[in-house]
Amino acid sequence: MNYLDFESKIKEIEDKITSLSHVFEDEKTEAEIKKLSKKRLELMESTYSKLTDWQVVQLSRHPDRPYFKDLLPLIFTDFQELHGDRTFGDDLAVIGGLAKLNNKPVMVIGQEKGRDTKSKIKHNFGMMHPEGYRKALRLMKLAEKFNMPVVTFIDTPGAYPGIKAEERGQSEAIARNLLEMSALKVPVVCIVIGEGCSGGALGIGVGDRLLMLQYSYFATISPEGCASILHKTAEKASEVTQMMNITSGRLKELKIVDEVIPEPLGGAHRDYETTATNIRKAVAAELKILSEMTVEQRNSRRYDKLMSFGRFKEA
């Protein structure tokens, strides 16, 4: 397991527990492991109850954190991937298709970063091209045609900023998705599972309900980008994060985010199955409420929600 800087003391205890577990077990060893386990639990509860916003950002980027492809089979069944935007190509930074949630059909779409070097390159580190946003929109319109809810998973450092992406209309593709998603006639639930950065996240992030995993962030710019603009150096990222209001708890207070999905103690990377279960329950509950509304009620609420954004408040 990989550890972050602020987890060094936890690592020390867990290393001791691991080494002792390989020793011949006797009453003394068992007692020591029990003692260390209790100490570890207390330390973890203390550490994660007072995380700074920068530490939350670090957790959202944890190398072992579950990505969309990890969570997909744990939340949904009968997934059938659909490819391409029918215009240019198939962007592998986003994966989408038909699936079932608690035996009910849904259209699921998620950004995928990739785990190792090969898969990171394959999925372009989760940075979508215009054809990715157009593919996502094609699947959403298909879901609308067959009256299926849409569930999107957001995890990206931003839309791909390359020249080719700009030539193919990156800004138009994102803007088109904002327009179309705001008027979809089916329930739309969006979940930030890691990084939710800039227009890259917004392109699949407009819906009836926006949920966030506890240790994720949602921002117009990365902390490093903000620090580079304000202080001319990315090294000030930890300082500016505190005033950006980008973590799940702060965004819930500002009513940008509707619900915060709890993660296992220590973060989602410590228990994929519990994380997936929490997401599945939260999404199912939201879809149940939304499905009981008429199209007019949902769209009216969605409009009111979008219009409430942008109110000024001192950070």
Curated annotation (Swiss-Prot):
Top-level taxon: Bacteria
Known EC number: 2.1.3.15
Pathway the protein contributes to: Lipid metabolism; malonyl-CoA biosynthesis; malonyl-CoA from acetyl-CoA: step 1/1
Organism: Francisella tularensis subsp. holarctica (strain LVS)
Self-association state and partner proteins as the record states: Acetyl-CoA carboxylase is a heterohexamer composed of biotin carboxyl carrier protein (AccB), biotin carboxylase (AccC) and two subunits each of ACCase subunit alpha (AccA) and ACCase subunit beta (AccD).
Catalysed reactions, as listed in the record: N(6)-carboxybiotinyl-L-lysyl-[protein] + acetyl-CoA = N(6)-biotinyl-L-lysyl-[protein] + malonyl-CoA
GO terms for MF: acetyl-CoA carboxylase activity; ATP binding; carboxyl- or carbamoyltransferase activity
Chief place of localization: cytoplasm
Protein name as annotated: Acetyl-coenzyme A carboxylase carboxyl transferase subunit alpha
Function comment: Component of the acetyl coenzyme A carboxylase (ACC) complex. First, biotin carboxylase catalyzes the carboxylation of biotin on its carrier protein (BCCP) and then the CO(2) group is transferred by the carboxyltransferase to acetyl-CoA to form malonyl-CoA.
Residue stretches making up the CoA carboxyltransferase C-terminal domain: 36-289
Entry-linked Gene3D superfamilies: 2-enoyl-CoA Hydratase, Chain A, domain 1
